[in-house]
A protein has these predicted regions:
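Hydrophobic/basic alpha-helical segments
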Residues: 1-145
Length: 145
């Protein structure tokens, strides 16, 4: 079921709570099915998800978005960064050299689009994660952040 939920997820990643909850409900039902546990006591689903070591789909989509952005920066993806995405002109002591200028969207939909959300999250990552060049190590480091 997960491959169907994650197909092209970096691009279509929902941002509205109601859509996020609908997707998480699918994973929760799948956990019940896999573990054959239909109890309705509080905390049952959380325990099932922890036993299965299934992080929330929203976390997985965030990692997928950041990984795709990392691949685009490293030239490992067919996706090229648009010309509107530029690195920061000046570096502060509190920022890193891989920082990008955040886009200034006018609409809520654009504010939650792939590039706007990903650049904001990218800029908040620690330097030691952003300095990783190999994609598999970068992805693993994201799971620890």
């Amino acid at each position: 079921m997960r491959p169907h939920l994650e197909y092209a997820s970096p691009v279509w990643d929902p941002w509205m709570d109601k859509h996020i909850k609908q997707l998480e409900a699918v994973q929760r039902r799948s956990a019940r099915f896999v573990k054959n546990c239909w109890a309705r006591t509080p905390g049952t689903i959380t325990k099932l998800l922890n036993d299965l070591d299934w992080p929330p789909l929203q976390v997985r989509r965030k990692i997928a978005r950041l990984t795709l952005f990392h691949k685009a920066i490293q030239g490992e993806s067919a996706i090229e960064l648009p010309s509107c995405i530029k690195g920061c002109n000046r570096q502060l002591r509190s920022t890193h050299h891989n920082r990008f200028t955040e886009l200034r969207p006018r609409t809520e939909a654009y504010r939650n689009s792939f590039y706007c959300r990903t650049i904001k999250e990218w800029n908040s990552l620690p330097n030691n994660v952003l300095d990783i060049e190999k994609t598999s190590l970068f992805q693993k480091a994201l799971t620890l952040v």
